[in-house]
């Protein structure tokens, strides 16, 4: 007996010691874990990751950036039945317990003890899931489980039940980069929460358990099983819905499919510029902070720009030969539509041109083709008219080709991906706001932004900058310069003999006519007359870097490597009266709470805000290397130009706090150049632009050697626009693909939309000018140049040879 009592005493002692040790261990663990628990008060001001939204100036969606889809909602925006679906699925006693479901924990412990499973369901309330989602990792351990329980109790003590449920619904992962119930509803069903049906609510409630492997797109069978057998039945058991409602929902097939937010304005190159600028400004996290970025892009103009570039490149291809099918696939004679469509997998649409595979052709010249969505299209015989070959001789079964919508609804035309590229950039000339930007034919195919990154030779479209320097130096539009052969020789004995494009010479001619006709030899002689150093320094006033401009006479022919955006910026100086503006794209930035955190305040061109700068660069001389500036035969006092009856553009004075753009060049030089460039449109290389029926259209075409580049830069109304066409491999565009043929039609089509209902921009002579007759032409001349004009017309001396030789250094 005593021995038994001794054993019992020892056993009791051991049990007491073990209990104490257990209590101490548990207490130590509790202290160790609880002391390291995060402050859950942050949940009241939690910032969930949200994508960045980019909008046009008129509020249309351009792009959404970010690794996740999330659109946080308040609990009051969640329909009651949707809340019930989640409660039935995840935590039926959510509004009853204090964060811990002890029944669920007991059930989980029993399963652990009676099975060989290491992980068992049950035991995690919605509050515990919130604790895990925000503060813990996914490690499966008792230590993490204890931390989860402790955090859940703390959360329940400081947050209301609806606040906890709101956090859960906004934080949970639903697969396919969708976080939160609102993003899931939009992605899987393209609906807002209040538009969901019961079957859709139940499907969404079943996703968080298996978000990647059990969502209704990845595995619709598994998702339906969970919806029907678990979620809906649990809702019935809890009296959230009736059995009839559940049966009706179960009868509906799974119909989820990807739904991306509807992009309202296609401007991918501009959107990428915004993305890069936001990262530079706020760091990589900028894409997940829910910023709303409003750009300067005009939705209507951007869509017009995209359409114009696509049409222009399609027409370019139509002028050249059909290159054949994009690829050919051998298909079985009995292959059905679905089999044919499967061959298009991985072939994306580009620039509005859709890939199709030829099913068959008809003797009448039509072709039946299949799209990737399994739909069939009939191409009429006219679809290949531009190739000069009927469709039934051009195509065969299995050919993969491109089509795009025709002018009439339901019509399709045969196309081919263009071998050339094009870019269009359009600015508000008065403040530099980017209104439209197209960086290439297809952002999908190539993300290289040719508007801002491609450096190409502008050719003759650079000449207005050289002519501007000459006018500043003392030339005037009526100055006579010989269009005659000339040979330049450097110190090493190398010679350069520039040529006109047509290989002909017109002899002495006014520089106005030389610009209108784009005579190369006159441009070279002008530059040689005013000096390379002077010209380079002067041209930097347009925003170019001096090291971008070649330090030789070839500069006058546009051999500098410049971006289309920089050319447009330079032309803006002519369009706005002589001020240098800075292009800009981001107008406003709002945070996730729609609070304004950034507002751009660009420098604005304003002629009435500053006195006219009539001495921007060096003083002029009366004679430059023997060139006559024109003899005045009659001088009249300055008088205003007659205005027509059309409305004219008047630029309102800006707010006093608006920064002023610096004056770049003399406004009188601007007036002369604008007048000359308007003549380029009226009677020069850009007469096609007369179809716009406006008197304020001015610009200059540009082409480079072997037709590698084609340009048109010009302005009208408030906009300055540059269009470039060329090939990325610097190969020729083809015979006679000049700027007026390849680029100008794109410019015209775009500006027809851009200038609709816009007032006519004036070009009135500013103060400090006198109207006089020079060399048989009436021109406006700067007052200080009147006394410098020669008393005789320039004539080549008879003793001079046809070819003159100059030294160049």
UniProtKB/Swiss-Prot annotation:
The reaction(s) this protein catalyses: [GlcNAc-(1->4)-Mur2Ac(oyl-L-Ala-gamma-D-Glu-L-Lys-D-Ala-D-Ala)](n)-di-trans,octa-cis-undecaprenyl diphosphate + beta-D-GlcNAc-(1->4)-Mur2Ac(oyl-L-Ala-gamma-D-Glu-L-Lys-D-Ala-D-Ala)-di-trans,octa-cis-undecaprenyl diphosphate = [GlcNAc-(1->4)-Mur2Ac(oyl-L-Ala-gamma-D-Glu-L-Lys-D-Ala-D-Ala)](n+1)-di-trans,octa-cis-undecaprenyl diphosphate + di-trans,octa-cis-undecaprenyl diphosphate + H(+); Preferential cleavage: (Ac)2-L-Lys-D-Ala-|-D-Ala. Also transpeptidation of peptidyl-alanyl moieties that are N-acyl substituents of D-alanine
Chain residue ranges for the region called Transpeptidase: 411-749
Assigned keywords, A-Z: Antibiotic resistance, Carboxypeptidase, Cell inner membrane, Cell membrane, Cell shape, Cell wall biogenesis/degradation, Glycosyltransferase, Hydrolase, Membrane, Multifunctional enzyme, Peptidoglycan synthesis, Protease, Signal-anchor, Transferase, Transmembrane, Transmembrane helix
PANTHER family per record: BINDING PROTEIN TRANSPEPTIDASE, PUTATIVE-RELATED (PTHR32282), PENICILLIN-BINDING PROTEIN 1A (PTHR32282:SF27)
One family name in Pfam for this protein: Transgly
Family the UniProt entry places it in: In the N-terminal section; belongs to the glycosyltransferase 51 family. In the C-terminal section; belongs to the transpeptidase family.
Keyword tRNA processing in annotation: no
Pathway: Cell wall biogenesis; peptidoglycan biosynthesis
EC number(s) from the headed UniProt entry: 2.4.99.28, 3.4.16.4
Record's protein name: Penicillin-binding protein 1A
Species this chain originates from: Xylella fastidiosa (strain Temecula1 / ATCC 700964)
GO BP term, pick one: proteolysis
């Amino acid at each position: 007996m005593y021995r038994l009592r001794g054993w019992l005493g020892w056993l009791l002692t051991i049990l007491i010691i073990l209990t104490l040790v257990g209590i101490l261990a548990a207490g130590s663990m509790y202290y160790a874990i609880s002391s390291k628990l995060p402050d859950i008060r942050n949940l009241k001001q939690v910032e969930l990751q949200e994508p960045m939204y980019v909008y046009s100036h008129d509020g249309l969606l351009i792009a959404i950036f970010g690794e996740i889809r999330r659109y946080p909602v308040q609990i009051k925006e969640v329909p009651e039945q949707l809340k019930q679906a989640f409660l039935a699925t995840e935590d039926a006693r959510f509004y009853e317990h204090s964060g811990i479901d002890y029944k669920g924990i007991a059930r989980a412990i029993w399963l652990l003890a009676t099975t060989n499973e290491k992980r068992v369901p049950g035991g995690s309330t919605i509050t515990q899931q919130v604790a895990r989602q925000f503060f813990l990792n996914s490690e499966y351990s008792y230590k993490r489980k204890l931390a989860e329980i402790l955090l859940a109790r703390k959360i329940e003590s400081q947050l209301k039940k609806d606040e906890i449920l709101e956090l859960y619904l906004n934080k949970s992962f639903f697969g396919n980069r969708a976080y939160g119930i609102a993003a899931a509803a939009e992605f899987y069903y393209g609906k807002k929460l209040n538009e969901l049906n019961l079957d859709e609510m139940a499907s969404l409630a079943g996703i968080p358990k298996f978000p990647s492997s059990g969502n209704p797109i990845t595995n619709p069978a598994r998702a339906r099983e969970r919806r029907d057998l678990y979620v809906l039945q649990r809702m019935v058991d809890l009296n959230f819905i009736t059995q009839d409602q559940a049966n009706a929902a179960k009868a509906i097939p799974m119909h989820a499919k990807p739904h991306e937010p509807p992009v309202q304005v296609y401007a991918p190159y501009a959107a990428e510029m915004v993305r890069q600028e936001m990262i530079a400004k706020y760091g990589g996290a900028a894409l997940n902070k829910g910023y709303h970025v409003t750009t300067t892009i005009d939705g209507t103009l951007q869509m017009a720009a995209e359409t114009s570039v696509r049409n222009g490149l399609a027409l370019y291809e139509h002028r050249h030969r059909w290159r054949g099918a994009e690829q050919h696939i051998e298909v079985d004679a009995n292959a059905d539509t679905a089999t044919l469509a499967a061959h298009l997998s991985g072939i994306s649409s580009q620039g509005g041109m859709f890939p199709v595979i030829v099913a068959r052709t008809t003797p009448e010249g039509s072709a039946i083709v299949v799209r990737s969505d399994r739909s069939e299209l009939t191409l009429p015989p006219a679809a290949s008219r531009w190739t000069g070959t009927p469709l039934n001789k051009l195509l065969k079964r299995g050919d993969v080709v491109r089509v795009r919508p025709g002018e009439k609804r339901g019509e399709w035309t045969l196309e081919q991906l263009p071998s050339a590229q094009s870019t269009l950039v359009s600015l508000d000339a008065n403040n530099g706001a980017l209104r439209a930007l197209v960086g290439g034919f297809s952002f999908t195919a190539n993300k290289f932004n040719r508007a801002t990154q491609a450096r190409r030779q502008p050719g003759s479209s650079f000449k207005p900058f050289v002519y501007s320097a000459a006018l500043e130096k003392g030339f005037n539009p009526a100055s006579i310069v010989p269009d005659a052969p000339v040979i330049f020789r450097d110190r090493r004995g190398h010679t350069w003999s520039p040529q006109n494009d047509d290989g002909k010479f017109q002899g002495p001619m006014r520089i106005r006519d030389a610009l209108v006709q784009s005579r190369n030899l006159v441009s070279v002689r002008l530059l040689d007359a005013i000096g390379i150093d002077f010209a380079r320094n002067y041209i930097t006033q347009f925003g170019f870097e001096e090291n971008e401009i070649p330090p030789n006479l070839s500069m006058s022919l546009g051999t500098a490597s410049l971006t289309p955006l920089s050319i447009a910026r330079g032309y803006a100086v002519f369009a706005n009266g002589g001020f240098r503006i800075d292009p800009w794209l981001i107008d406003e930035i709002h945070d996730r709470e729609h609070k304004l955190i950034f507002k751009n305040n660009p420098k604005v061109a304003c002629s009435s805000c500053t006195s006219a700068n009539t001495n921007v660069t060096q003083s002029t001389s009366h004679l430059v290397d023997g060139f006559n500036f024109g003899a005045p035969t009659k001088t009249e006092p300055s008088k205003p130009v007659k205005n027509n009856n059309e409305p004219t553009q008047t630029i309102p004075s800006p707010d006093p706090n608006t920064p002023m753009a610096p004056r770049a060049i003399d406004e009188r030089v601007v007036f002369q150049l604008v007048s000359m460039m308007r003549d380029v449109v009226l009677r020069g290389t850009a007469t096609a632009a007369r179809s716009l029926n406006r008197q304020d259209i001015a610009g200059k075409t540009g082409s480079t050697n072997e037709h590698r580049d084609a340009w048109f830069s010009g302005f009208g109304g408030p906009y300055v626009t540059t269009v470039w066409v060329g090939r990325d491999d610097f190969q020729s565009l083809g015979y006679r693909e000049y700027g007026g043929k390849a680029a100008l039609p794109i410019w015209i089509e775009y500006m027809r939309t851009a200038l609709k209902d816009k007032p006519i921009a004036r070009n009135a002579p500013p103060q400090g000018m006198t109207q006089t007759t020079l060399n048989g032409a009436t021109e406006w001349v700067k007052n200080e140049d009147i006394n410098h004009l020669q008393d005789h017309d320039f004539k080549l001396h008879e003793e001079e040879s046809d070819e003159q030789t100059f030294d160049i250094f």
